[in-house]
Amino acid sequence: IQALVAKLEARHYEGLKYNDELSKEHWQEYIDALDPRRIYFTQADIDAFKKYQLELDDQAKKGELSAALEIFNLYQERQIERLTSLTQALKPQIDKLDFEKQEYLLLDPSKSPWPESEEAMLERWRLYLKNDVLNLKLAGKEPEAISETLLKRYQNQLKRAEQITSMDVFSIYANT
């Protein structure tokens, strides 16, 4: 990471410096890259991570990634936990969905606040599940095929989450 920062500062056509201002932008882009739908982090998590906004540049210049790894580890833990829970009880969760009830889901997550609690995060997950089921229904899928499709989708996401390596984390961090 030190070499990457040095090259960025030496070769950028605008003479870009990785300073506190850029660190703050990088922090936001990294959080958004990990959790674009805002379904893994709560507002409390984001508030706790804010202590790193002005540290990413300093850490990178020293070759440290501890802040990035701490953020990523919580993301991965929540992702695996949620996808495991979802795949283990998908059919009952689908069966409980009420399509007569009018509900809204902001599809542009940047306009949504971070969930205030675990319950609010789970509610957002429920709305995304309902949206996925509804889209498959509208595409003409039968109920059993919907369950199978979503189970495969979530199992694949879980498998990918469990296979992430430290190089993958570095790549996500360096490319945001």
Q: Predicted regions span which residues?
A:
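Flexible, low-complexity junctional segments that flank or bridge functional domains
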Residues: 1-176
